[in-house]
Every structure is written in structure tokens, then in C-alpha cells.
Amino acid sequence: MESILNIRNVSKIYQSAGRELTVLNNINFSVSSGSTLAITGPSGSGKTTLLGLCAGLDRASSGTIELNGVVLDQLSEDERAAVRNRYVGFIFQNFQLLPTLTALENVMVPLELRGAKNIKAHAMELLDKVGLADRSHHYPVQLSGGEQQRVSLARAFSNTPALLFADEPTGNLDAETSEKIIKLLFDLNKDAGTTLVIVTHDPELAARTNRVIKMKGGLIIADENPSYV
């Protein structure tokens, strides 16, 4: 199967108080198109930093990152932003909804950035899929945590991304709401045929993916393929 994400010899080093802090150390892996991958590990293991590098939110100190055929290493910030807008969707632990926009307007943002047509109708269709059509004109402060994450899901899938990155998507939700969000995430992902990369502490969420990469101290310590039906 063709790889949509290739990580080769990637390291990330920060300068702190005159010393070097190695957050990622010579990371190597590829992600097959259409697959689902979980990246797990304790806090400070480097998994969120790795996710940011994979998405082009930051530059690696060394190594090569290729996303959907585009090598990110030498691109400017504006060029990386254009790649993200074209190929990538995001789901965040803290939802990251714009507080001055309604649920509908939040979902419309990526579509507007791409200059898509029939923006409002498409955004409403996605809100309907996540069960929030009747809350489309509510602002984030008027929505529960679970509802905000459902808006975030609709927004993430709005531009039909080739690759979706989810950083602790259930981290701020209770167990019952988390299960609903997980089911919705995988249902939407299956319908869209999107490649899904999740950073999570939740072993049940990780077990639902095709593959689990475990990290510790900036290193990959295991690369597993859990069974999930």
C-alpha cells in the first residue's frame, strides 16, 4: 500500500539555558494511505512534538518529513500552511474552536480558506452527520464539551483531508462522551477514506487503530499492529 507519510531520521532538539534538549531522537516510520495509527506514550515522550512535525506545524532539527508526496523540510511557513490547508485536518484536545464564530461558521472556515463552493450547505451537511444541525447557530460557549468536539470533528473533515491528525481527542471528555466521540471519529473516517493519526493516552482508543507506535524518551520503543474488527 502506498505511503502517505514518510518520516526519515527525524530529530528535534531545543536549546534550553545553554544546553541541548533532545525531544525526538532519530525517528523513522511510514504511514500507509487509508490506515489508522495511534501514537502512545507517557507525558514528555515526544509524541505531540512528533505530531506537530508530521503536520508541518514546526520544523525538525534534522531528517526528512514527506507528506502526500511533498517534502516539508525546506518549505517556508506560508508554504507549509498551504500544504496543511490542502491535505490535512486537525482535532485537538481543547477543541480550538473560534469563540466569536457559531458552530456552522467554525466548520465553514477551512472551506472558505480553500475557496470551496456551496460552503454553507456542505458545512450544514457535516453538522447533521455529527448530530448538531439544530445547534448550528450556537457559539462554542453555549455548547457542552462533547458538542464542541463534534463541531471540531465536522470542521476537521470539512475539507476532505488526505490525512487527519488528532491530538488527545477525548482527553477533556468523560467516559461516556469519549466513547461517542470515538465511534463518530471512526465512522466519519471510514466514510471519508482518510488516513488517521492519533496521539492518545487511552489504550482503548489506541486498540481500535490498525497500528500502535509506542514512544518513550523521544524514541520509538515499539511498533505494533493490534487486531481490531
Locations of regions flagged by a protein language model:
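ABC family nucleotide-binding domain
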Residues: 2-215
